[in-house]
């Protein structure tokens, strides 16, 4: 008979019946060490950050712009030049009704 071209069973040098690793190596990971637990923390952190950014954006668009405008007006001690919404235009010949600088 011809010699086998491929060896189906490994040779005795590379093969042994006893496992190489110890029993502790094959124990499953604890729940706190899994990558799924870490991923869930990342997802929760991203949701909290997006929620906080959304609240800040809504607060700015709804009332913080008006509050900043009001504080600037109080700092200037006059609210005549500050317009809310559509304000009528001045005609060039009218000038300042108070007589002071603009």
UniProtKB/Swiss-Prot annotation:
Recorded superkingdom: Viruses
Disordered, as annotated region: 82-102
Subcellular locations according to the entry: Host membrane
Pfam families: Gemini_mov
Single GO cellular component term: membrane
Xref: InterPro entries: Gemini_mov
Coiled coil region boundaries: none
Keyword presence, Iron: no
Main location as per UniProt: host cell
Record's function text: Involved in the viral transport within, and between cells.
Self-association state and partner proteins as the record states: Interacts with the capsid protein (CP). Part of a MP-CP-viral DNA complex.
Protein family membership: Belongs to the mastrevirus movement protein family.
Protein name, entry field: Movement protein
